[in-house]
Structure formats: structure tokens, C-alpha cells
Amino acid sequence: MARLFGTDGVRGLANVDLTADMALGLAVAAASVLVEPGGNAHPRALVARDPRASGEFLSAAVVAGLASAGVDVLDIGVVPTPALAHLVDTSGADFGVMLSASHNPMPDNGLKIFARGGTKLPDDVEDVVERAYREGGGRRPTGAAVGRVHGGPDVEQDAQDTYVAHLLSTLPGGPGSLKGLHVVVDCANGAASAVSPRVLAEAGARVTTIFAAPDGLNINDGCGSTHLGPVTAAVLAHGADIGLAHDGDADRCLAVDARGNAVDGDQIMAVLTLALRDRGQLTDDTLVATVMSNLGLRLAMQREGVTMVETGVGDRYVLEALNAGGWSIGGEQSGHVVLPAHATTGDGVLTGLHLLARMAETGRSLEDLTGVVQRLPQVLVNVRGVDKSRAGSDAELLGAVADAERELGETGRVLLRPSGTEPLVRVMVEAAHTDHAQGVADRLADVVRKRLAL
């Protein structure tokens, strides 16, 4: 039986892959697993969502499931995923549940669970929750022991206000320190809409906002971090210093410089890593990144005397490594950046704020700051219709990968990775020249199709 939880919670087509019944059942299961025996008579949980339409009935189902299991619920409405994580941490709640499919199209939705302290659940705990869900049962109190539910517009506004105040408190130069910078921010018609433009403005920046009018149907629709065209055009049209683009739940951020060049998570991490180093805040001179980060980032960090630790794909694996090592920064090429001093998970609004802070404190352009990373051409081929479970064990395929690595030498890299959320194998190749990377990737993709055919 396929595992429900992927690399970032449960995700799929709302009302088909993720139904109200499933959301309710997972909520009951989470309550049975995450509430400590003998703890609070009424454990507490926070529930939030992004603005997509299906989030309304799915969050209602989660709230119902939790309350029926004896959990008091604070429904904080539409806020970014990192806002929920922060509020779970600072409020002392037992856990939190977020309804979002991040950058996915509007018809999809997802459910992710945050433990006490605002951290994502480890794989083994997700497995226990999934087992409890499949077995059914769980806590079913009666009378005064059932959970109570609180929510509404005032609760949502208070959650947003608290999150904005927290973000401003992290600003190295304090409120107003971004004065003189003009930023275009694309909120993807998502959860960032009510907070990202506001926090940037309160930090002193001149803000031009696009795609910040969510109606439940337009989230990620031709906008946001997966569609950089609109924010690029707006930066050039307005003569802005920088553009920021969030995804639907604002746990990631990509950028565009004043000349319209895209800035990915690797480049953002490099800028923020060196900022921490220059302030004496980069623990062990170490950056944590995933195996998908461009080799150019590793080479740049080597030149700067920074050690790079690699993890699997997913910001929770980055966070696990950060916590284990006590390090200061980590993230993904996709724009998830984790700053443990200020957040318990990837936070796109925080990332954008600190990127502008670095520009303000140095007086340098984003193009100049990101020049530290010389990205190698990277080619990614998704091979569908294969048995991804054999990708790490087929001898002929592994031999082909080894041959490719020898061919590329120190100026290239090969990564073969089964997708954690889709039935496919990703072949990623980096080389000094695009044609070389494409040729190697195509050859390996052919071997994958041949050797892993169903």
C-alpha cells in the first residue's frame, strides 16, 4: 500500500485524493498520536490554510476531527505555513495542522502536521499517524471532554499581526531600515497576500504588489514562484531594485534582480550565508543544502571558506540537519530557506525580508551580491512510467551513473532521484556546458527507461 505522506505531508487532488473524510480521519489520528498521555485534559491545536477554495471544507473537517477527539482548536484562518509553525511554537500548542498544496494548482490541496515547537513531523512519526488513521478508532470523548473551537476574522487578524511583529523583530537594521529600496512582491494570490507587502512596507521599503487578491480560485494561476514572468516584467516596468515571488503558502521565495535576472534559492542562500558570516552569526561557518543544489553553490562556498552539508530533498530534512548540528542556515534551490534563529521551517516572507536587509546594509545591488555563485548548467529529465523503487539497486543503471560521473570529473555532477510525490525518476546532470549536460542526461534517461521498465 502506497504511503500517504510524501516529502511534504499528504497532497493530491482535493475531494479525490484528499477528501473531507480523510482529513477528518487524519486529524483524529494525529490527536491520538501527538497528544501526550496524562497531559492536558484539553490539548490544544492550531489549524490554518491557504486561500484555495477546497481549504474551506478540508479545514472544517480537520477542526471537526480534532474537536471530536477532545482537542481544543484555534482556527486561525488564512495565514502562511511558517506563520502557523511560528504560532504553534510560541503559543505552546500541542500541534498544528496546515491545509495547503503550496505551489500546486488550485484544484490540489494538502495536509501537513507540525509537532509541539512548530517543527514538521519526522518520517517515523508520520508513519505512526498513518497507521492510526488506517486502523481507525482514536479518542472519542463525550460531554465536557469534547474539544471547543474558536476562530473568526478577529482571530485571523490577530494571528497575522503577531506574525508580522515577529518578522519585523528579526530585521538586522530594525523597522525602517529598508528605506530607499523599491520591491515588487508577487503573492501568488496566496497566503502571503495579507502579510508580505505589509511587512516589507513597515520595514521601510517602497512596495509594488501584484497578485495579492485571492478569491479561492486564482492561487498560483500564472503567478508566484513557479511563474516568474509577471514579477520580472513588473520589476523592469517600475524600475524596482528587486522582485520577490512567493508560492501559495509562502514557505518559499524566489527573486528577480533589477535587470530581470532570476535569482534561485541557491543564490539566496549564498547571499544570506555570507551575511551571517559577516555578522559573526554563521555557526561553524556551515551551510546546509539539499542534493539538488547546484554545484556552483558548493564551489562558491568553498572559495569563501564555508562548509556545505548535504541532505535529502525537503526542507524538513534540512531542518533536521540544522537542529542536529546547531547550524545557522539551510535551504533548497526551490526557494525554501530556513533560518533557525527566527523560524522553525522554511519561511518565504522572512527570506525576502532578509534578502532586502542585506542589500540595505551593504548598499550593493542584488545582481552584485548574487555574483558570488556561478551556476553550472543544470539539466533535469523526468522519466515516467518506470519502477522507481529499483533506481538505487539496478547494477547496470548504477554502472552507467558511475561512467557519467567519471566523464564529468570535478566540473560536473549526476543525481538520480526517485520522486517522493510522483511515479517518476528524476535524472539531474550538471556540467560546464549545457550541451554536455543534456547529452549525459538523455543517455542516462534512456538507461532508466530500459532498466526500470514496468
Swiss-Prot record:
Reaction(s) catalysed by this chain, per the record, are: alpha-D-glucosamine 1-phosphate = D-glucosamine 6-phosphate
**Which Pfam families does this UniProt record tie to the protein?**
PGM_PMM_I (PF02878), PGM_PMM_II (PF02879), PGM_PMM_III (PF02880), PGM_PMM_IV (PF00408)
Answer yes or no on keyword Kinase.
no
Keyword annotations for this protein, in alphabetical order, are: Isomerase, Magnesium, Metal-binding, Phosphoprotein
A cellular component term from Gene Ontology for this protein is: cytosol
Which Gene Ontology terms cover its molecular function? magnesium ion binding; phosphoglucosamine mutase activity; phosphomannomutase activity
Q: Which residues form the active site?
A: 102
Modification(s) after translation:
Activated by phosphorylation.
Give residue numbers for the modification (Phosphoserine): 102
Listed binding positions for Mg(2+) are: 102, 247, 249, 251
How are cofactors bound according to the entry's free-text note? Binds 1 Mg(2+) ion per subunit.
Matching SUPFAM superfamilies, A to Z? Answer: Phosphoglucomutase, C-terminal domain (SSF55957), Phosphoglucomutase, first 3 domains (SSF53738)
Entry's NCBIfam families? glmM (TIGR01455)
What protein is this chain from? Phosphoglucosamine mutase
Organism name = Kineococcus radiotolerans (strain ATCC BAA-149 / DSM 14245 / SRS30216)
